[in-house]
Design a protein with these regions (language model features):
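Alpha/beta catalytic cores of nucleotide-metabolism and tRNA/nucleoside-modifying enzymes
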Residues: 16-26, 34-37, 42-141
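Glycine-rich beta-strand-to-loop/alpha-helix junction loops that act as flexible
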Residues: 1, 28-33
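Conserved alpha/beta-domain cores
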Residues: 1-22
Length: 141
């Protein structure tokens, strides 16, 4: 799922409903961005599992994610780094891989940071099922 168009969402919802009607599990391949997890949840699409290399690819191309925010292309656009740092502070994101400006120079740190952002997004979506107020707060970020 590289692009979540309305048609993609309708198709995924229909596939999920059909799979569940037969007692099957529902896996989605290729979640490209952690924000997609929230969008899927908002559409009533809750896969049993998913996979992604988006965190790896984005980091390799100089982009970093925050759990529920846009991606930032920090290696080529100085303003994007500033926006990322502001969004990071606003969202209280803190991981050992993005503590300083080395993130702009180290592909491995970006990749690992993006993996943490995906894991945090999954946790927010999972907590949202148990704590709707937390989920709604996360959606408003």
């Amino acid at each position: 799922v590289n692009l979540l168009s309305q048609n993609s969402l309708k198709l995924l919802k229909a596939l999920q409903d059909e799979a569940l009607s037969f007692g099957m599990k529902f896996h989605i391949f290729g979640i490209g961005n952690p924000t997609y997890l929230v969008r899927l949840k908002n559409e009533g699409i809750e896969p049993t599992s998913f996979d992604s290399t988006g965190w790896w690819k984005a980091g390799g191309f100089g982009k970093v994610f925050l759990p529920l925010s846009q991606q930032f292309h920090i290696t080529r656009k100085p303003l994007a780094l500033s926006r990322f740092l502001n969004a990071k502070a606003k969202n209280s994101h803190d991981c050992p891989f993005c503590l300083d400006s080395v993130l702009t120079k180290s592909r491995w740190l970006r990749v690992l940071h993006n993996l943490v952002a995906f894991a945090e997004a999954v946790q927010i979506v999972m907590d949202g099922a148990q704590k709707p107020d937390l989920f709604l707060k996360a959606l408003r970020r």
